[in-house]
């Protein structure tokens, strides 16, 4: 170290300056360290949870969802015959229109979509509301009428099972797969018989063949899978009746363009997975902006701390600066001394922040939790992307360099004659 300083007098001078103000130097380093730690932890936590949600969403929902959109209610009968507001008319018992949710020619559309080389899988779907009864327990939920083999191609149903076997639905016509939360509410397990009642009042005896846990809280707490034919029976519909077509793509990033293409081609509403979850992605954007603002504020405050320390050193070391200039040191040399000091504070605080941020993220990621939000997580999901560490360290260096630049310029402009005369 001493040999290095002997060869590099500017480094030695900067070193002496920093250690002449140990307390202030340590406080400035701690400010940088804290900012970098918060940057790494918050970025890792937010992106970890967001990536986990996106992964779950991509694997458990359709990349493109085709359905018959329910249109707005028809105008009131009065408006057809009376177009002024100066009369009072009472109409009773106007019959509501029975909206047709069926996707007509669904099988033909599925056949055409299957031929699209961009498509990995396509499956019919029939969704309905129902009541689940098991003993004295009763829960409302949703029923997904599916072709279980096709559904597994899209959403890997078998991988999400925590008990039972989905293939039993092929040999057991009255089989049902319950979401884990729904099964817990009912107190039902594999092998139990439950009663399912539709909004039409049709009741079916079903046998639980499997329990599914996707990690998507709403699905696990309310959804059950049954065969497409049983769903049609519950709604008293024919074997061709479906309400939705779900599509899984080979490249999920093409979902928006393909959804628009299918909507134009087949005449039904087609929604890509990002549009379906637009509200959640909006929350993500707000979170990211908030955290970015907080992190920048912390690093800016630490930068002001470095600025104040260097300005204090400059005014205290004015005679030293005058002597250095009298010895032949140029303005650029004086500037370099104070820039070295700011970089030393920034790099040391940054490296300590990287270490503390990594340790904090590791420890927090190991704490067992049971969070039930959009998704269910047992532990906080932390993203250890190396780019976060590089960005945090780079930002620390930039902020401290900027903080040291102005004091360095001021020190370089001092006139040694004026300094000595004022003393």
Language model regions located:
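Short, membrane-interfacial amphipathic segments enriched in basic
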Residues: 1-12
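Hydrophobic alpha-helical transmembrane segments of multi-pass inner-membrane transport and secretion
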Residues: 22-49, 285-320, 343-352, 398-402
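Hydrophobic, regular-secondary-structure patches
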Residues: 46-140, 171
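Mechanotransmission and gating elements of multispan inner-membrane complexes involved in transport
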Residues: 70, 182-184, 190, 195-291, ...
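Beta-strand-rich non-transmembrane domains
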Residues: 137, 144, 161-177, 197-213
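Transmembrane alpha-helical interface segments in multi-pass membrane proteins
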Residues: 311-313, 319-365, 391, 407
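Short helix-loop junctions at transmembrane helix boundaries
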Residues: 351-394, 405, 409-413
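Short cytosolic juxtamembrane segments of multi-pass membrane proteins
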Residues: 410-423
């Amino acid at each position: 170290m001493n040999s290095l300083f002997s060869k590099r007098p500017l480094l030695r001078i900067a070193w002496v300056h920093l250690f002449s103000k140990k307390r202030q130097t340590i406080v400035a380093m701690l400010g940088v360290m804290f900012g970098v730690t918060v940057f790494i932890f918050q970025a890792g936590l937010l992106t970890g949870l967001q990536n986990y949600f996106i992964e779950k969403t991509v694997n458990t929902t359709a990349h493109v969802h085709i359905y018959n959109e329910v249109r707005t209610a028809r105008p009131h009968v009065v408006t057809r015959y009376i177009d002024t507001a100066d009369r009072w008319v009472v109409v009773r018992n106007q019959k509501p229109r029975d909206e047709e949710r069926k996707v007509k020619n669904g099988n033909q559309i599925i056949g055409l979509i299957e031929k699209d080389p961009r498509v990995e899988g396509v499956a019919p779907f029939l969704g309905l509301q129902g009541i689940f009864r098991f003993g004295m327990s009763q829960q409302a939920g949703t029923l997904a009428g599916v072709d279980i083999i096709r559904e597994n191609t899209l959403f890997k149903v078998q991988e999400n099972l925590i008990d039972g076997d989905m293939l039993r639905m092929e040999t057991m016509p009255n089989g049902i797969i319950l979401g884990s939360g729904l099964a817990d509410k009912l107190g039902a397990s594999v092998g139990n018989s439950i009663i399912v009642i539709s909004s039409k009042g049709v009741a079916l005896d079903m046998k639980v063949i499997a329990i599914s846990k996707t990690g998507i809280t709403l699905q696990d707490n309310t959804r059950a899978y049954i065969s497409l034919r049983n769903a049609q029976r519950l709604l008293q519909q024919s074997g061709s009746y479906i309400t939705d077509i779900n599509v899984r793509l080979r490249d999920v990033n093409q979902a928006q363009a393909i959804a628009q293409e299918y909507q134009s081609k087949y005449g039904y509403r087609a929604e890509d997975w990002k549009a379906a979850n637009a509200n959640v992605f909006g929350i993500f954007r707000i979170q990211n902006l908030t955290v970015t603002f907080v992190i920048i504020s912390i690093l800016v405050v630490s930068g002001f701390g470095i600025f104040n320390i260097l300005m204090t050193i400059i005014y205290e070391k004015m005679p030293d600066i005058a002597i250095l200039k009298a010895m032949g040191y140029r303005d650029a040399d004086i500037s370099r001394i104070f820039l070295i000091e700011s970089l030393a504070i920034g790099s040391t605080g940054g490296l300590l922040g990287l270490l503390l941020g990594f340790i904090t993220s590791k420890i927090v990621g190991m704490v067992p939790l049971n969070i039930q939000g959009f998704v269910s997580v047992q532990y906080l999901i932390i993203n250890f992307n190396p780019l976060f560490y590089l960005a945090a360290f780079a930002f620390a260096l930039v902020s401290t360099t900027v903080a040291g630049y102005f004091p360095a310029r001021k020190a370089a402009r001092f006139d040694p004659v004026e300094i000595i005369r004022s003393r």
